[in-house]
Amino acid sequence: MHQNTNVDPQEIAKFERMAETWWDLNGEFKPLHLLNPLRLNYIDQTAGGIFGKKVLDVGCGGGILSESMARIGAEVDGLDMGDEPLEVARLHALETGVSINYVKNTAETHSQDHQAYYDVVTCMEMLEHVPDPQSVIKACCDMVKPGGFVFFSTINRNIKSYVHTILGAEYLLKMLPVGTHEHKKFIKPSELIELVDNTDLICTDALGISYNPLTGIFKYTPKVDVNYMIATRKVD
């Protein structure tokens, strides 16, 4: 798929509509705020610390992960195709005094002049929102330095993930707006690893994240049957 066509306008519009609530801790993005400390810790620990490292956050949205990485000393570029989320991200960074370079671009186009440029690349909850995940994964691989880390997170595709993520989170618990996810776009871990294997990345770890609706707490789990992250490293 051509680099400029790997964007779903409906997906962009979906997050444009929700942009103004991005930093509302009790709003539509509350799950991302609750989940973010686990993601940040996993990235920082697995990459051997990101302080002083060049990091790219692909599909950064309103900047929740980008800001948290910048706060612990990473030099962060945030990449997204949504005008409203990027505007929210820039404003919030300005208000909080965090230095982040936000760019409107696709991963594929950004990679053209950022070959082997970053120490760490993150692509969280983004692959299930693009027409061609393989194209994004290849671009992420191209942009990370040899020996550098690329992190992906997405949602497994099975009955349990449909019940938890769509019926539960969207319809019953109202944690997310109805229509945030499409089950057919979810990606099985085996499929994601196969896509990774088509590049110079090697999967080094996989970790699940579970949510307890009674306590409102996310935690790590070895089970990758719903939400999961993988760590990959580029071959030297």
UniProtKB/Swiss-Prot annotation:
Binding-site positions, S-adenosyl-L-methionine: R39, G59, D80, M124
Pathway annotation: Cofactor biosynthesis; ubiquinone biosynthesis
Task of the protein: O-methyltransferase that catalyzes the 2 O-methylation steps in the ubiquinone biosynthetic pathway.
CDD domains tied to this protein: AdoMet_MTases
Reactions catalysed: a 3-demethylubiquinol + S-adenosyl-L-methionine = a ubiquinol + S-adenosyl-L-homocysteine + H(+); a 3-(all-trans-polyprenyl)benzene-1,2-diol + S-adenosyl-L-methionine = a 2-methoxy-6-(all-trans-polyprenyl)phenol + S-adenosyl-L-homocysteine + H(+)
Species of provenance: Shewanella baltica (strain OS155 / ATCC BAA-1091)
Superkingdom per UniProt: Bacteria
UniProt-listed InterPro entries: SAM-dependent_MTases_sf, UbiG_MeTrfase
Entry's EC annotation: 2.1.1.222, 2.1.1.64
GO MF term list: 2-polyprenyl-6-hydroxyphenol methylase activity; 3-demethylubiquinol 3-O-methyltransferase activity; polyprenyldihydroxybenzoate methyltransferase activity
Stated family: Belongs to the methyltransferase superfamily. UbiG/COQ3 family.
Name of the molecule in the record: Ubiquinone biosynthesis O-methyltransferase
First-tier enzyme category under EC: transferase
Keywords: Methyltransferase, S-adenosyl-L-methionine, Transferase, Ubiquinone biosynthesis
Gene Ontology terms: biological process: methylation
Gene responsible for this protein: ubiG
Record has S-adenosyl-L-methionine as a keyword: yes
